[in-house]
Amino acid sequence: MARSTGKDAQALFHSLRSAYAATPTTLKIIDLYVGFAVFTALIQVVYMAIVGSFPFNSFLSGVLSCVGTAVLAVCLRIQVNKDNKEFKDLPPERAFADFVLCNLVLHLVIMNFLG
Amino acid sequence: MHLKKNRTIFSRRLDSPVVATNGGSVIKAKSRWQIGPHGTRSFSFIAVERLALPAHTLSPRSRSLATLTDDPHQLFKYDLNPDVSQVLFFWISISALLTSLDGKCYYRNGQESITISGAYFGDFDLPRRWDLPSDFRLSPICCSRPFQTRGRILRQISSFLLLFNFSLEEAYEALRTFEVLGIEKTAELSKAICKSVLGTLESSSSTPKDLFHALGVNGILKCSSKEETFEDQTSKTDLHLSDAEGTFRSIKALSQSDGRWRYSSNNPESSTFAAGIALEALSGVVSLASSEIDQFMIGAVKNDIVKLFDSIEKYDDGTFYFDEKLVNMREQQGPLATTSSVVRGLTAFSSVITESLNLPGDKILGIAKFFLGIGIPGDTKNFFDQVDLLACLENNRQVKVNTVLGSHAPPLTVTLVRAFSSSARDNSIIENQELKFDPQDAVYFLDDLPASFDVGEYIFVFKMLVQDSEQQTVYATGTLTQVPIYVTGLIKIENAKIAVLDSDLGSVETQKKLDLAGESTVSVSANHLQKLRLSFQMSTPLGNAFKPHQAFLRLRHETKVEHTFVVGSSGKKFEITLDFLGLVEKFFYLSGRYDIQLTVGDAVMENSLLREIGYVELDLPEPPENASRPPPQPVDPYTRYGPKAEITHIFRAPEKRPPEELSLAFLVLTILPLFGFIIGLLRLGVNLKNFPTSAVPATFAVIFHLGIAAVLLLYVLFWLKLDLFTTLKTLCFLGVFLMVVGHRTLSHLASASAKLKSA
C-alpha cells in the first residue's frame, strides 16, 4: 500500500506540475511574487524567534507588509485570471492599477508603523 | 485790613487783549510788611495791574517778568481755561517776589506803579466757575519756636534735600518744617536750594506752581538775587484783586451743604480736603479784595465752617480729626492731610475776617491731641502736615496747659480734683488739691502725697481754669484730664521654700530653703509617688498683701518639653503643690532631670524676677502602650528647610539587543528572496515586449514607473527623517500625478490589447 501511495503522490505531483505549466505567464509572475513575499515574511519570523521581539512594532510591520502584499497579489491573480467568470468584464489593467494603489497605501501605513 | 476802593478795569469778556488798558489808569497797590503781634510776618497777597509801558523802560528783571506776561497765551499756556487759581498763583508769585526783593518796585512817572500783568482774559471766554486745583495753597509763614528735634525724619529731610534732586514743592515743605521746628539749615543746603529757586524764578517757562513753591522757599531762605534792578525803592505799593466778589462767589459756589467743598464744577465729588483749600483761597481772595466783601457772604462761609465741624470724627480717647467719607477720590488724602488742610484754611480765614470765628474749643483740642498723639509719622509729607498744623494752631493760641509747641501758658489754676486707685474707683485718696506753680520750671507740682500711698496703679484727674477771664476766649482748655499713674516700689519676697512631700502621709522628705534674691540653685529628687511644694510670701513696702500679675512655675525637661503652672495665693502666702501621681500622664512619662524656673512679675514691682531655681530629678514609671507621645519640639528652621537626602534616579535598563553581526546577516538574508524573485522572473521569460514604443505613450509609461519609484522613495524618506504630515502632503501631489499618468498609460495598454484581441 505504501508504494501505491508513494506512486500516487508522485503521479499527483506530476499532474500538478504539468497543469501548472499550462498557466499563462502573467499568472506565473504573480505566483512567483507571492512566493517571494511569503518567503521574506518567514525569514523575519525566524529572526524574531532568534533575537526576541523587542521592537515588536517593527516586527509586525515587516511581517504584515509581506503578508499584505501577498494578499493583494492574490487578489490581482484572481481578477486577472481569464478563467474566472466573475471578473470577465474587468480589464486587467484596471486590476493592476488597483493593485498598485493598494500596495502604495499599505506601504505608507507600514512605514508609519515601522518606527 | 485797609483797602482802597478802585474801579475794576477789566471785565470778563474782552474782545481784544488788554495791552493798553483804558487810559492806563493806575491801581495803587500796597505791599504789606506787617509786623504783626507775636512777631509774625505775613505776606499779603497782592494783585497787580498792568500798564502799558514801553519796554525799554523796564529793567532786565522786570522785563523778563513783563515778557512773561506780554503774551496772553503764555500766561495761560498751561491750561486752556484760565482759572482763578492760575491767575492768583501768578499774582502771588509776583508779589512775593517783590517783597522778597525788599519791596523794590518799578515805577513810572514818579507814581507808584507796577508793571506786571493783570488778568486779561483777552481772547478767552471766562468760565462762570473756576476750577480749583487740589494742591492750591496759600499759607502765612509764622514764627518758629524751639522744639525737640526728631533725629530720624529730619535727617531724612535734610539728606534728601542735599541730594539735590528735590522738587520745589518738597523743598518748600521741608523748609517750612525746619522753620517751625527751629532747626538751622546747613549752608550748602541753602545754597543749593536757592540756586534752584532762582533758576525757577528767572526761567520763563516755569509753571505757576513752580513759581509759587519757589517763592515760598525764597521767603523762608531769603535768597537774594544780585540783580536787583528795580529802579526805585518803595515800601508801599497797593495791589489788590479786582472783582474779588466774583471770585469769592465762585469759590463759594463750589461748597456743599454739609460743609465740604467740591474740587471743580465738573467734578461732583466733594471732599473735606477741598474745603480746607477753599477756605484758604477765600481768605486769600478776601485779603486781596479791593473792596469789602459782602458780610453776608462771610457769614455764609462761617456757617459752612460750622457745618464742616459737624462732620468731624473722633476716636475714643478724645482726639478729633477730619477724614474723607468717600473712598473713591482720585487722590485719597489721609486724615492727616485732610485735617491739616482744614485747619490751615480755618486759620487763614480767621485771620482775614474782622470778627472772630466761634469754634468749639474741645474739638480744636481734640484735633491738637490727635496730631500730638500720632508721634512722628514716617512720611515727610505727613510730617510737614503735622508740623504745619501745629504751627497754625500755635499761632492761633487755642490750646491747653502747655500750648501745642510748648510755649508758655498764661496764669492758670490747676487743680487735682481727684486721685483714686484704679481698682477702687469710688474711694478717692486725694481730693481737690491745688497744685503750686513753680515759675522757674513752669511746672505745677503737688507737694506732699499722703502717706497711705502704696504701690499700685492710680488715676489722677486734673482740671485747669484760666485765671484771667479775658483770656478765656483765646485759650481753650480741656475739661477734666485723666492721667494714669503707676506707683512702684520694692516688693519683699521672703520665706521661700521648696519641699518634697510623701503623698500618703504628707510628711516632708526633703526641704530646702530658696534664696530668691541670690543666685544659688537647689536640687531635689522625687518619684511619682511624691509631691513637690514651693512656697513663699510677698508683701508691699507698707506691709500690705500684694498679688502680682504673674506668678508661674515652669518645669522643663532635658528634651525641652515644658510644663507651666500658676502659683496660687491666699493673702500674703504663695504656694504651689505638684502632685506627680496625677501629673504622670501630663508629663508624658518622661523621667529625668527637670529644670525649675520661677517667674514673679508685675508693673509696679521693681524687683520682678525670672529665675532658674534649680532642678528636680523625677522618676516616673514606664509609659504604657497607648500613652501619648510628647509633642514634637520645634526643629531648628535651618534644618527643616535644608537639603534633603539625594534621590538617585534608576533608569530603565535598556533592552538587550542582538549582536550587530546577526542583524546584518539577517538583513542580507531578507534581501535574498528579492533576488530569487528576479531570477525566477528571468527564468519565466519575462519580456518588455508590451512596452509601448511610440513616443507619447512611451513617455507616459516611463513617467508612470518613475512615479511609482518616487512614491517608494518618499516612503523611505518618511521612515528616515520626514514626519507624517509632510509625507502626506507630498503624497497628495504625487498621488494625483500618478493617477493621471497611470490612467493614461493603462488605458493605452488596455486599448492596445483590445485591438489585439479583436484583431
From Swiss-Prot, chain A:
Q: Which UniProt keywords apply?
A: Apoptosis, Endoplasmic reticulum, Membrane, Transmembrane, Transmembrane helix
Q: How does it assemble?
A: Component of the oligosaccharyltransferase (OST) complex.
User: Which protein family is named in the record?
Assistant: Belongs to the DAD/OST2 family.
Q: Which domain of life is it from?
A: Eukaryota
Name its pathway. Answer: Protein modification; protein glycosylation
Official protein name in the record: Dolichyl-diphosphooligosaccharide--protein glycosyltransferase subunit DAD1
Q: Which residues cross the membrane?
A: 32-52, 56-76, 95-115
Q: Any ranges marked Cytoplasmic in the topology annotation, and which? A: 1-31, 77-94
Query: Which subcellular locations apply to this protein?
Result: Endoplasmic reticulum membrane
Q: Which residues lie on this side of the membrane: Lumenal?
A: 53-55
Described function = Subunit of the oligosaccharyl transferase (OST) complex that catalyzes the initial transfer of a defined glycan (Glc(3)Man(9)GlcNAc(2) in eukaryotes) from the lipid carrier dolichol-pyrophosphate to an asparagine residue within an Asn-X-Ser/Thr consensus motif in nascent polypeptide chains, the first step in protein N-glycosylation. N-glycosylation occurs cotranslationally and the complex associates with the Sec61 complex at the channel-forming translocon complex that mediates protein translocation across the endoplasmic reticulum (ER). All subunits are required for a maximal enzyme activity.
Q: Which GO terms describe its cellular component?
A: oligosaccharyltransferase complex
One of this protein's Pfam families, by short name?
A: DAD
Task: Supply one GO BP term.
Answer: protein N-linked glycosylation
The gene designation is: DAD1
Organism, scientific name = Citrus unshiu (Satsuma mandarin)
Which membrane topology term applies here?
Multi-pass membrane protein
